[in-house]
From Swiss-Prot:
Protein name: Valine--tRNA ligase
Alphabetical list of InterPro entries matching this protein: aa-tRNA-synth_I_CS, aa-tRNA-synth_Ia, Anticodon_Ia_Val, M/V/L/I-tRNA-synth_anticd-bd, Rossmann-like_a/b/a_fold, tRNA-bd_arm, tRNAsynth_Ia_anticodon-bd, Val-tRNA_synth_C_sf
Entry's free-text remark on domains: ValRS has two distinct active sites: one for aminoacylation and one for editing. The misactivated threonine is translocated from the active site to the editing site. The C-terminal coiled-coil domain is crucial for aminoacylation activity.
Family designation: Belongs to the class-I aminoacyl-tRNA synthetase family. ValS type 1 subfamily.
Protein localization: Cytoplasm
Top EC class, one word: ligase
Gene name of this polypeptide: valS
Reactions that this protein is recorded to catalyse: tRNA(Val) + L-valine + ATP = L-valyl-tRNA(Val) + AMP + diphosphate
MF-aspect GO terms: aminoacyl-tRNA deacylase activity; ATP binding; valine-tRNA ligase activity
Main location: cytoplasm
Amino acid sequence: MEKTYNPQDIEQPLYEHWEKQGYFKPNGDESKESFCIMIPPPNVTGSLHMGHAFQQTIMDTMIRYQRMQGKNTLWQVGTDHAGIATQMVVERKIAAEEGKTRHDYGRDAFIDKIWQWKAESGGTITRQMRRLGNSVDWERERFTMDEGLSNAVKEVFVRLYKEDLIYRGKRLVNWDPKLRTAISDLEVENRESKGSMWHIRYPLADGAKTADGKDYLVVATTRPETILGDTGVAVNPEDPRYQSLIGKFVILPLVNRRIPIVGDEHADMEKGTGCVKITPAHDFNDYEVGKRHALPMINILTFDGDIRESAEVFDTKGEESDVYSSEIPAEFQKLERFAARKAIVAAVDALGLLEEIKPHDLTVPYGDRGGVVIEPMLTDQWYVRADVLAKPAVEAVENGDIQFVPKQYENMYFSWMRDIQDWCISRQLWWGHRIPAWYDNDGNVYVGRTEDEVRQENNLGADVALRQDEDVLDTWFSSALWTFSTLGWPENTDALRQFHPTSVMVSGFDIIFFWIARMIMMTMHFIKDENGKPQVPFHTVYMTGLIRDDEGQKMSKSKGNVIDPLDMVDGISLPELLEKRTGNMMQPQMAEKIRKRTEKQFPNGIEPHGTDALRFTLAALASTGRDINWDMKRLEGYRNFCNKLWNASRFVLMNTEEQDCGFNGGEMTLSLADRWILAEFNQTVKAYREALDNFRFDIAAGILYEFTWNQFCDWYLELTKPVMTGGSESELRGTRHTLVTVLEGLLRLAHPIIPFITETIWQRVKVICGITADTIMLQPFPEYNAAQVDEAALADTEWLKQAIVAVRNIRAEMNIAPGKPLELLLRGCSEEAVRRVNDNRSFLQTLARLESITVLPADDKGPVSVTKIIDGAELLIPMAGLINKDDELARLAKEVAKIEGEIARIEGKLSNEGFVARAPEAVIAKEREKLDSYAEAKAKLIEQQAVISAL
């Protein structure tokens, strides 16, 4: 084996070999249990980020673990067309390169342009997924816009429409005036903002007066430009100031519209003046109030967010109405919405109706992609009736057919599902699944899979002109069908029969409603088992937290704190990293700050760590459902772990290759250390499997680390040295056999988390064991064997380890050279302790560097010594001639003084109010942690001073 572990040399060739050999495919054995995971489809034109790496590591670990248990496993891979994101990327690209818009191209040519762009850049993310070691079945790769999935989408739309579960209606949506499309709540970013509250007088009609004799109401608003669309004023029915006015009217300033005063709980007596203007076409709350009181809806804005030339007036059902005039005063027509705000405030003021303006903190909705303020807009959209679909989906979680890990996410799911709103599924984009609906010139709507089908079903001749709906479906609509459309539905395929319902879905909690809930609803509606019972899409939902930076901040391009997972695998120079973080920024003014921070954090760029180290770190940080603060130190630690495993394997191979390891017969004698490591490994297998079965990847990683580093490398390899240097033939055979057996089992155990290094080493180890199989991937996963429990070996070895550690600690505390042989005395020994010393004298002497071991008689106190208590005995190391008492005390005093200086420095920092107020939470926590560890170190030094003073 190569002297040093170099992941760059082994990982890519190995992956290509695995893929070529077809090891990632299901084994096709239908007598075996199936296990299937559907990858959450990443955006086709995107690139891999830490969240992907994290979730995919967890999925691959599960898939490899189940595959090694002989199950028929499928990890289904694919990508998402990501409507709005992809269209924006391509629009930006043609604007930058050609100075054109999509309208210059026209719909078909622009869509061709997107397909072209997908062909060029769509492979990036799948290449990166290969680098992570993902054992997905690439031959089954799907894309949400490929033919099969597009057919499934049409099928679902048509069936839901025929069942009256899809309808078209005029509703209020989040409208992005820049992108000119409806967007989902998920794409709205609410920002805190300092604004104003305008108090405006609305004159009362018909001579009405308020309780205190005024002939007007004062209405408070943060959006005066929408006055043009007001159709009512709401007051709280309990408010004594206005109770008598409910049912009366006001005259709307500027347009002189007579609008009613309604009593509604939405008006808060404590807030503003207690009177709220109601604009049903431009505010979500007002829309609901309007529905309750049958107020008309008046749309005053164009899709670009400008004031219309004439308003659109609708009744509550969304039908056109002439109940109010559609006139808009000429001076406001065509004004941009924020310019209109200024003009309207000035006009109200000129009429003497502006009572006051107060500063006001408010939350403003922005589109997360377009970056402009979102308008609630009344538009014709397609909707799915969600309540009917939600009922069985709620029951499936209530009765345990679907379980959330961790369980607390069920509450989040229930709270949303039990109060579910109809789902707006249409988007005013060009890229996506076009809605399979056609209109004739009379405005009739026909829904079908194709235009031909529509004509046939409705007996429409060639003389009837049909035009297809311009809109496309929300990306989440096709994603909601992911678990079954990828397996060939609506055909009843073998894959669907074998792998549905799928086993586990790994997802971030942020898309629990947008994706998880909708998959459950759609799947249960369309997929039934042989008894007609609705099928769930998956049995378990494993929820992950977000990956944040080391200070707990969300990773984002604008913060400049994003780390590309592949930069940790391959390494990246500082100049390249700076270019990545500061090039093409939306906010170039942030570049300098980001540059400084990056130079401080990565002065030499990022070292290459290899895929296995990255995967191990991700698994180790995966504490259920919690956000993770990324830690480069942990990554270094797991890179060191891979080195340790490599070096330990080299040691084993050097001592076993071409040697008699007992695999072809011959007498074997197992030492206590051999029996101990076999028993220890057996226990490790049990705990490790339990952790993986319970989705505790963090615990599994910890168990693997602890066994490999501490038990196998630090202890067992040391404990084999006495046999290796002076054992009999049968003892040598026994120890070699144990070395190879445990290493081979350990490689299989670790394989799901760190696949590359384990396969590479296993290819060498299998030869010694006489294994002829091609790959570790398809080897059986280690199983716990109750017959291999060896309590005596475990207890005896733990005692020996205690004794060795005690001697080593005395050396360290007393500053005695590690190589200096010591005399060990044991006082007050139990019979068990005496037996253990006598049985393992040579082990103890070799590993603790002792020149002699003496068990003192019961009445012998022994010479002046440093002592340690272990089970059933007190260890004494006589100090005569070993240390100079005065020198040692002086050295310790110096150490104490140094630590006291550090403690004073940190205490000063933490008592500085300015520092505590400004520094991030994580930085303060780190300082407190340092303080605690210094205090602990000081206490230990003082203890040592006391021991030496007493000598």
